[in-house]
Design a protein with these regions (language model features):
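Basic, polyanion-binding surface patches
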Residues: 1-196
Length: 196
């Protein structure tokens, strides 16, 4: 499997645009892999390191794995995520189903972290957690708490619920494009081709 290394900051605009539409956060623990759709996150520099910050609610299955492994991958589509993948990974729990199998995703061994890359979402950021912080709802404006953390919605509900997020600051230890997927795709798209 050919992986073309990229400078993540050269692709920041494309990564953040994809994030707003939904990308995958993938974790692996005890031989179980789970992916979830995320649309909240940050890409930048902190502690003189490239960092991706992701947010995971307290009751999510992904959080239980992430707290043990302390690494993750961010998997980004070249265009938009397949609707089946988006539906399965965005509305189902890995406690109940094998989302990788249900969404027909192909896992690729990562270069450094234990969590795998996903062939069908070929832009990959491998991240090691350097810091994590649980959000304090009392410190947020009331309108945000009401909209994003409705206290009358159980923490097991998909979407907005009463559980706060934990912010995970992941040092990006590897970043690349899985090229085999691009070559086999019916629609050859290279993001930021001039930066090769």
């Amino acid at each position: 499997m050919t992986k073309r290394k990229i400078n993540v900051l050269d692709y920041s605009s494309e990564i953040l645009k994809a994030l707003s539409k939904g990308i995958l956060l993938t974790v692996k623990g005890d031989e179980k892999v789970n992916s979830m759709v995320i649309s909240w996150g940050h890409l930048g520099m902190e502690w003189n390191k490239p960092i991706f910050i992701t947010y995971v609610r307290e009751n999510r299955y992904t959080k239980a794995i992430l707290d043990k492994t302390l690494d993750f991958t961010i998997n980004i589509p070249l265009d938009k995520m397949d609707t089946k993948t988006f539906s399965i990974c965005g509305t189902k729990s890995g406690r109940d189903i094998d989302k990788i199998k249900e969404a027909n995703l192909t896992l690729i061994d990562s270069e450094i972290v234990s969590s795998p890359a996903v062939k069908e979402l070929p832009i990959t950021l491998e991240c090691k957690v350097l810091y994590k912080q649980k959000q304090v709802l009392d410190n947020l404006p009331d309108d945000i708490v009401k909209r994003d953390y409705p206290q009358d919605v159980d923490g097991t509900a998909v979407g907005s619920n009463r559980d706060p997020h934990t912010a995970y600051y992941g040092e990006i230890v590897a970043a690349y494009i899985i090229e085999e997927w691009i070559k086999g795709c019916c629609k050859l798209i290279y993001w930021n081709e001039s930066k090769k």
